[in-house]
Amino acid sequence: MNSAAPAGMSRLQKIALIVGRLALAYLFFTQLWWKAPPRFGCPEGFAFTTGAFDGGRLRLQRTSGLCDWLGVESVWAQQPRPVLVSNLDNAGQPEIAVDIGFLARLNGVFIDGLVKPNIQWFGYVVWGMEAFIFVSLFLGLLGRLGGLVAMAQSAQLMIGLAGIGNPYEFEWTYHSMLVLSVLMFAFAPGRYLGLDAWLRPRLAMAVEKGSRLAGLLRSLT
C-alpha cells in the first residue's frame, strides 16, 4: 500500500478529507464528558432508564449518563425500527423504509446480557473507544484504525437509536456518522497533515526487515 496520495487527488480533496477527519474527531470529543469515568454519568447504584408502552405511547423513567442511553436502547430494542424512511406523498405511512428490528433486538440482547450487568467495567470500554477515536483522528495517528473503530461505534449507535420516537433521535444524524466513519477508513486521512505521514515510511523500513507487526500497523495508517 503506497503512502502517496491516490492518483488524481487534488489539494481541495485533501483539505476536504482533513476537515472531515477533524470534524468527526471533535464530534467524539464532545461526547466524552457527559459519560466520563468512573461513574459514566450514571446515578447512584448505576440505575438504568426503564420504560413501558401505555396506550401506544412510550413512558420512560429516565436516569442519567451512559445508564440513561443504554436503558433507552434496551427499551426500544423490542419495537419495530424502520430506518431510511421516505414518505413520497407526505400522507399516511412512509412508502420506503428498511426495518432493522432484528438488528435492534440483537443489540438489546447484547446490552441487557453483557453491557448492563457489567457497566462498572464495560463503561470504560465504551469511553475508551470514543477517546481513542478522538485521539486517532485528531492527530492522524493510525487513522484507518480510528475510522474502523468509529464505524463500529457509529453502527451500534445507529442500530440502537436512529429514528426512535421518545426521545426523538433524527435518524440521519447516525447515518451521517456512519458514512463519515466509512470514508475515514477508506481514505486513510492521517496521511495528510497527520502523524501517519511521518510514521508510514518508518514502518515501511521495518517491513522490509521482516517485521510483521510493522506490516499490520502500516495497514492501519
How should these model regions be labeled?
Residues M1-F132, L139-T221:
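Extended, low-polarity transmembrane helix blocks
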